[in-house]
Amino acid sequence: YYRDYHSGSAKTLKSIQITLAARLEKFNLESLASLTATDELDLPSLGEKKTALFALIPDNDTSFNFLVSILYTQLFQQLFFLADHKYGGSLPVHVHFVMDEFANVSLPDDFDKILSVMRSREVSVSIILQNLAQLKALFEKQWESIVGNCDEFLYLGGNEQSTHKYVSELLGKATIDTNTYGKSTGHSGNYSTNYQISGRELLTPDEVRMLDNRYALLFIRGERPVMDLKYDLSLIHISEPTRLRC
């Protein structure tokens, strides 16, 4: 590569140098250079022993989002390689990614393809979004593929119209029996009954919007939708040291 680079004209070399300097500018920071100088995480071990790895970045500053993208890319590549070449295609310890603020973090290239092949390797993700509009903005053409590759869909509430419509359609329709009675008065009074079956959305988009905040809707592949109370997180006992770390 260096030989190819050096074969260019002086103007081309200067342009490459400027582009490279701009790309690597953040690595001039001593703290970032120190963080990325050596590998201390042993990423493949996540698929071999129980481990919790937290990646915390400020939600109001995207300057270092690329680090999380690098971390995700390295994790998926190394875990897939470990599963395929050491354990016959499936990791001994399941690895679950909780991808909070999914829309605000840089993602690996071809994430939709990664999502479609991870299950057999004992890798899974929870994609957490404010609404489906965020997913459509990130993956204009592949968003339906991403939703389709998720076996579970949990709706906690929201105020975005396209999400309400999607959830309403996902719920499907209910069958309604309708009885209509008619009676005419007079000399030859008649009495009639009309019976018909019709369909109605289980919840209309407006009813989805007005869903009681205590409830959530859960969709599991191959099962009927479930409406249930959300779990009260205040019931979980958190020890004082853990509370302080949070």
Task: Annotate each language-model stretch with its function.
Residues 1-123, 138, 206-227, 236-239, ...:
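P-loop NTPase motor domains
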Residues 51, 113-116, 134-235, 239, ...:
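P-loop NTPase motor core of the ASCE superfamily
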Residues 103, 131-133:
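Acidic, glycine-rich active-site loops and adjacent beta-strand->loop/helix elements
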Residues 124-129:
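Structural recognition of the conserved hydrophobic beta-strand(s) that form the central parallel beta-sheet
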